[in-house]
Amino acid sequence: MLDLEVVPERSLGCEQWEFILGMHFSQAVCIMQSQVNNIKKVQVIYNEDDPLASDLVLSLTHDGIRLLFDSVSQRLRVIEIFNMNMVKLKYCGIVFSSPEVVPTIDQIDHSFGATHPGVYDAEKKIFTLNFRGLSFVFHVEQACEPRYVRGLGSLQFTNGSSPVASKMYIFNGNSLIDSKPPPLPISCFFSHPYLQNLEVLRHNNATLGVKLSLLCEGPSQVLEPRRHSCVQELKFGSSVQDVLSLLGAPSRVFYKAEDKMRIHSPQAHLRAPALFSDYFYNYFTLGLDVLFDGKHHRLKKFVLHTNYPGHYNFNMYHRCEFNLHLPARSPSAEATRLIDLSPTFITVTAYSRWDEVCERVQHSSRPIVLHRSSSTNTTNPFGSTFCYGVEDIIFEVMPNNLIASVTLYAAEEVAIANSKSDLR
C-alpha cells in the first residue's frame, strides 16, 4: 500500500516522488515507470474519436488514484483518490486515512481544521466538504436537515454516526468544477527548455524556418529559481552550432539508417546511395525534431509533433503549439467574376482538423499510407496514418482527422542562401 503525503492545491507524493499539479503527462508516466515495483497497474483513458473533448486520465487501479490531465495543455489538473481504502494518506505528517484510521467527517475536521459548511446533494445522496485546493466526498444514505450553526458538528445524521469519506480531490483554486492546471512548476523543469508557441516563417509560399518562444529556468533570485522566457529563430541551412547555441543540447540524437520515403521521389532508382547518414536532434520538451545533412551538417528539415493519444509516438514528445499560415485555395472562375478577392490565408494549428484544412488548401490528391513499427514490435496497435503534401510541407493525419505531425522541408535555394549568409 502506498504511503503518501497530501499537500492541498499542490501535490500527492512521498520522499522519493510526487505528483504535482501542473506537471506534464510524460513526467507522471516517468514516475510510474521508476516505481514499477510499487505501482502495479496503470490504465490510460482518453476519448479516441475526439481526444480534446475530455480529460486525459492515468488510472492507478490497484492504488485507488486517478490523475486527470487537461486535454489541451496535457498538464495535471486534478488528483483524485477514488478509493480511500487502497492508499494510506497523511497531512502534515499525521495519518488521516488508513486501514487503522477511518476518514470520517470528524477525523477530517480534526486533521484539516474548520472550513465552510459542506454541500449536501439530496438527489445523489452525496455530502461534499470543501477546503481550498481540496475536497472530500461522503456517501450519505439519509441525512436530516443540516443546521450549519457551529461548523461541521452541527450536521446531524439519522443514525448518529459520522459518514466516511469515499473520495478525495486535490486541485488548483477554490472550485473543483472550475479548476484548471497551473503553469508548469519550476520544480518540474529539470533544466530543459519548454515551448510556449512556435511560428512557422514563410515567404512567397516557401518555408524559411521557425520562430520559437521558449520558457526555461532563469537565474536564481534569493535561492529560488525563476522562469525566463526568450525568442529564438532557426532557419534552414543553420549549422549544428547555431542550433546548440539557441536550443541547447538535444534530448536524443538519432541517425537515419534509411530514407523510407525515397521511393516516392522521381527517378529514385538512379540516385546513388548516400555516403553520409543524416541525423536528427530530438527535443522532446519542445515537441520538435530537426534534421541535419550528414555531409554538410546543415539544418534541412523540421518535424513538429502534436502528441495526441492514439498515435505511435504518443508520450514521447510534448505538444508543439505551432501556428502555420498557408495560402487558401484560389476561388473558382465564376466566383472571381462577381467579386475581386485579395489573397487569403488560413491558419493551421496543433488543434486543426484535417478535413477542414484540406477544403481550403491545395494538397496532394492521394495520401501516402504510413505504417509505423519498431525493430522489437512489428505490430502497431494504433493503426496507420496518412501523409498529405501541401507545397513544401507534409501533414501526417490520424484516422480521427487530427494532425499527428507536420514536416517542414527546405527548398534547395533557401537552404543554400541561408548557409551562404552564415559564412559571410
Describe each PLM feature range.
Residues 1-424:
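Short helix/turn-capping signatures at newly exposed starts of structured segments
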